[in-house]
Structures are given as structure tokens and as C-alpha cells.
Amino acid sequence: MAKFASIIVLLFVALVVFAAFEEPTMVEAQKLCQRPSGTWSGVCGNNNACKNQCIRLEKARHGSCNYVFPAHKCICYFPC
């Protein structure tokens, strides 16, 4: 019984040591470039509608209403 317990403890210690030396994997963030929506018309006042239109119609990653002088415009974000 004591031999079994020492094997379990040894396996646990080996697992802890292995986990301590494991490097965390980091995913590199992809840069996004912005440009005004080509399908949006008028002043942008609804972020969700702008986002959906950018994603569905222009195949962008994201979209939002941003202030660009003189009004809010729908801006789409694409991978650079």
C-alpha cells in the first residue's frame, strides 16, 4: 500500500513539474484596417446595424459607427 501511494505522489509531482515548464501559447492578434462602408447610406446611428451590414454585405470582420467630420459614418474593419 505504501508503494502505491508513493507512485501516485511521484506521478503527481511529475505532472506539476511538467505543467510548470509548459509555455503558454499566445495567438498573435491580427491587425485590422478600417474604411468607410461602401453599402451604408446616410448618418450612422445604430452600431449593431452597421456591424451586421459590414459583416454580411462587405465580408468585414467588424463594423461600428464612428464620428468622421461632419457626421457619424459606418466604418468597416478588414484584415490588413
From Swiss-Prot:
Signal sequence range: 1-29
Record PTM Pyrrolidone carboxylic acid, positions in chain: Q30
InterPro entries reported for this sequence: Defensin_plant, Scorpion_toxin-like, Scorpion_toxin-like_sf
Effect of K73Q: Decreased antifungal potency and increased sensitivity to inorganic cations
UniProt keyword annotations, A-Z: Antimicrobial, Disulfide bond, Fungicide, Plant defense, Pyrrolidone carboxylic acid, Secreted, Signal
GO biological process, one term: defense response to fungus
Location of this chain's protein in the cell: Secreted
Gene3D superfamilies to which the protein is assigned, alphabetical: Knottin, scorpion toxin-like
Major localization class: secreted
Annotated consequence of substituting S41R: Slightly decreased antifungal potency
Disulfides per UniProt: C33-C80, C44-C65, C50-C74, C54-C76
Effect recorded for A60W: Decreased antifungal potency and increased sensitivity to inorganic cations
Pfam family, one: Gamma-thionin
Source species, domain of life: Eukaryota
GO cellular component labels: extracellular region
Effect seen on changing G45M: Increased antifungal potency
Family the UniProt entry places it in: Belongs to the DEFL family.
Function according to Swiss-Prot or TrEMBL: Possesses antifungal activity sensitive to inorganic cations. Induces potential changes in fungal membranes and increased K(+) efflux and Ca(2+) uptake.
Protein's name according to its UniProt entry: Defensin-like protein 2
Record organism: Raphanus sativus (Radish)
Taxonomic lineage of the native organism: Eukaryota, Viridiplantae, Streptophyta, Embryophyta, Tracheophyta
